[in-house]
Every structure is written in structure tokens, then in C-alpha cells.
């Protein structure tokens, strides 16, 4: 009975445990990082925390999971050391840090956390030490000794030359008139300091970094009998101006100041809120070609997008960045903010020349390059940053440059440079027309395209959209990269030159002498009307050589039986359009005959029923034609399944003839005019 009771109690504890955990308060990011550091240090004894130190510096961080495995902070290697967690100390002869630190008053606790310089300056004032040692409840954000030592000499001199006013006020600004622990330090909050009730800005980032006026907490939550001490890495000062006021008084922001005024963003930048302004200097504007800069400054929408691309939705202090971080601007562009040693980077470039200029409504970082968003660019400017320079040169040579730099609403279908590895076509009337058919008469976004949609080109063609499981294609060409949406135009990067349809499937087959036997067979089987009318077909078209490679007996049987011939031909026709870019590892395509075709793509080679396609993607208005060098057999007609006496030998002849046909068919090709023009460029 006693055993049963114990088991029942254990079961209840297990059942209630998770519920109790869920009901408890969520830990702050700082506490979660501290907890991880404890876990990593527990092998060294109780209350031991793992700390990462950046090699060659005195910078230390409690370690999170990602940093633990990477062993890097801001790209610099780190070493792991093990220290007592906050609030604990070693005991001689004992493992780890088993003893809690004895509580003392704030003044004495400053010495415990290593802020002896703050103690020294406190002693110099007449009033502050008695307050720190007396009754009450306070929080002090105490600068480290290194923080005091790094102050400019003139600043330090001004403080110590008037200790009972300047120094006292500076120290009081680091204090709050109540106990505040890290769990209460919320991102974006302000605390009222003990100096003229001036605000202190608090930011608590998801990576566990906590900043006070952009100074990082080094050692937090050291309890005292009359409050708590947090050690920080900088001496902080009062914040008086908002972002707009700083822009107005700094000479290096003359151009930015004019741009902000013209855009109407000054109201936001002087209002409430918390922002990060990546503030371009005058030199940053001067680096932009005058034509581009004048165009943007003269376009209110582009100008607003440009400036919003330099504003983040919350305050981001430099100390919060310990690795690459994706952040979204007010304009909507994602920037990669990172660090390399002591330098901040944007999109991998060290363009921040001055950081952590604090404002009442955020923080400013000076940058030496303008961050022009796609939404403020022309199609030419979008293409300059993409792998489509060869295509852009062709558009320019063809006299289409005005369409790519003007204010027409267009979408450019630009093939990748790799498409032209074998050369580019001469610029003639056919090439110009082809290129015009790579420009859509509307500014599109790929996320709104749908299967079967038609798009009108500058060349007057109607192009179809095909949506597949893993690709989005326009005719035979598929989108190879994310859209770039500019001020008026959108850039689609395409995986090949687009071939507009030149006629129906029957027109395509009749126009190519490789298919004369297939055309005759289609006519004999009564399928001409089917392949001439509107529809969505995928035709695997056997060449003349494919028919000649059939065993004579098989060929005679087919040509002598219209019903059987129609059955075979329908097996070559899929009931939807499948271009090569839409083929995954394996697609089962239903044929008009009823059985399914197995279509696959491996190493950029399309195969149907495991036989390679000689030439894919000849587009027609009612489908697509893929050239094959063998005649496909429906499952019920294959020699092995019919028990044909000549099955083995016929199959061997078929394979040999198919191999010969694949080798020889290229010499007899007669392609439509666009395909001849692009023959050298096709994959």
C-alpha cells in the first residue's frame, strides 16, 4: 500500500510539473543566456558560468547556444573560461562557487563587482557615499574601471574639477530611486534617474544583451542591502535632443537635412517612438551619380523610400550586435547588420563611421554610403546588381534602354549571364523583336502570378504563366531568383532565353522536317484537329529516325492499323503543359491514351520513361513539344508484356537505332526562326 501511495504521488508530480512550469513567469532573454552559461559550467561545480572572452581584448560574454558552438563574437575567436555566476563566490577546498556572496550596502558592492573607480569618485563627493551606505532602495548602473579610463581627458577633467556639481550629477544620472532587476528591464523602456528625473533608455535584446543608454550590462543583478548594482561598460550621459534636432545641428548632415524636410519625415523624427537612423553623411550622397541622385530627390515617392530605408523600427545599439542579424527597415527592405571586431557592418560592408549617437527617440549611426532600396531604382539600376549584365547589354544595343530607365510600368524578363556562355546573337530585327518579347507591359510581382495567366509583351505576344510545385515559369523560361521591384519596373531573373510560341503544335511539327513521318501518322490517325485547336498539351514528338528505328514488323503493324496508331500517338500527348523547368525528380503525366508518362529531370537532362529527350521546350500556342528519338510504347503494347516472339531482338534493334538517331538527328533540324537565332544560347 505504501509503495502504491508513493507511485501515485510521483505520477501526480509528473503530471503537475509541466503545468506548473507553463504557469510560471517566462524568463527574460538575459536570464535564458545566463541559464545556458550555467548549464555549460555545471561540470565545474555549482554556480559556475561559462564565459566567452574575445581573444586579444577584455570583452566577456555569457554564452548562448549559437556562440558556444561557433566560438566567435563579431567574427573574432573566443576562449571559454569558467567564473562564478553573479551573486556567488568560491570557498577554499570546495568545487565550484557554492557560497552566496554576503550582502553589503551599495557602496561596498561596487567594490565586489569591480567598479572601484566609481567608489573612488563617490568618495570625492560630499553627499553620495552616505546615501549609498544608508537606508533606502536604489539601483546603480556602475561604469567599469575601463569605462572611466576610456573617457576623453577633457570630459574627465570637467567632471573632477567640480566634484559636487558635475561629478555628483553624473553619478546620480547612473542611479534609479528603486531596485530594478534584469527581469524588469524591458526592451524600449525608460527609467527615471536620480539626476533631475532625466530618462535612461533600456534595451533588452533577444540575444540576451541588455543596454543602458547603449552601454552593455557586464555583470547584472548584484544585490545589496539597499538596492542592486549592475556593472556597465561605458559612462553614460544625459540625452537631450531628438533625432531631428541632431540632424539639424550637425554640419555633416546638410544634404540629409534637406532631404528629410522635402520628404516630410521630420515630424516622425522629432516625435515619440524608438528608431535607429542610419544617417548618411554629405559624403555618402556625393558618392551617388548626380543623374541618379537628382532623379530620386526630384521624385517624392522614391525619396521617401530612400529615407525610410535608412530607418529601423526600434533602437539598435552597437553593443547588441555580436553576429549577423537581419533587420527590416521602415521601407520594407531587409538589411544584414553585423560586426567585424569593433566595426559595425551593413550588408557585409564597414560603412558605419560613428555609432551610438543617442537621441530621446532612438539612436543614430553615421554611414558613409547611401542605402538605395530597390523601390527607388530603375530597371537598369536593378539589373546592375544582378547576374544579368549580358542580357542588359543586349537590350541597350537593341535600342530598348529608354524602356528600362523611364517611368513606364514594366516587367523585364532578363536571362542569367550563364545562358549566354556560348555567345550572344547579332542585333538584327529578329533579335530586337525577341528582346521586346522579354518586356511585359505591366509591373508585376511573381507572388501574384497564377497558372494559365497571360501576359502581354512590348512585342505584341501573349505569354503564358505556368505554376509548378517548385517553379514558376513564363513559357519555356522559369524564374531563377526573387523579384527585384523597382520604382516603375520589376526585374525577373530567368533561367533561359524565352521562346514565344510560333503557332499550334501542328504548325510546329509541320514546320520542322524532322517530323514529316510523325505529321503523316497524326493525319492518318485523325488527330490533326486535336493538335490544331485550343488546348494544353505536352507532345513528346518522335523524329523520323525514331520511326525508322522501329522493327519493320512493328512499323508495318502500326501504319496498317489506324486505331492502334491513334492509341500509340495519344500516349505521346500529355493532357497539360509541362516545360522542362517544371519537372522535378519525377512527374507522372497523364496521356490522352489514359496511361501515365514518367517524366524526370536529372543533370539538366529531361527523360520520358527513362529515355532522354533530345530537345525540350519548343513552345506552341496550345502546348509544348519535346523532341524524342524513340517511339514510346504504352505499358500494354510493350514487347515484354505482349509476349512477342521477337521481343528481345526487336528491343535491341530499337535501342541501337535510337542511339543512331540521337547522334544524327541534329544535322537535319529545321527550327523556327527564333530557335535558329538562339541555337547557340540554349542549354
From Swiss-Prot:
Q: What is the effect of changing residue 527 to R?
A: In CDL1; late-onset; found also in sporadic cases
Motif (Cell attachment site) spans which residues? 642-644
Mention one GO biological process in which this protein takes part, according to its record. Answer: extracellular matrix organization
Outcome, altering residue 626 to R: In CDL1; delayed age of onset
Q: Which residues get modified to S-cysteinyl cysteine?
A: 65
Cell compartments where the protein resides: Secreted; Secreted, Extracellular space, Extracellular matrix
User: Keywords assigned by UniProt?
Assistant: Amyloid, Amyloidosis, Cell adhesion, Corneal dystrophy, Disease variant, Disulfide bond, Extracellular matrix, Gamma-carboxyglutamic acid, Phosphoprotein, Repeat, Secreted, Sensory transduction, Signal, Vision
**Tissues with expression:** Highly expressed in the corneal epithelium. Expressed in heart, placenta, lung, liver, skeletal muscle, kidney and pancreas.
| InterPro entries in UniProt | Adhesion/Biosynth-related, EMI_domain, FAS1_dom_sf, FAS1_domain, TGFBI/POSTN
Known role: Plays a role in cell adhesion. May play a role in cell-collagen interactions.
- PANTHER family, per this entry? PERIOSTIN-RELATED, TRANSFORMING GROWTH FACTOR-BETA-INDUCED PROTEIN IG-H3
Give the record's disease field. Answer: Corneal dystrophy, epithelial basement membrane: A bilateral anterior corneal dystrophy characterized by grayish epithelial fingerprint lines, geographic map-like lines, and dots (or microcysts) on slit-lamp examination. Pathologic studies show abnormal, redundant basement membrane and intraepithelial lacunae filled with cellular debris.
Q: What is this protein called?
A: Transforming growth factor-beta-induced protein ig-h3
Q: Which gene encodes it?
A: TGFBI
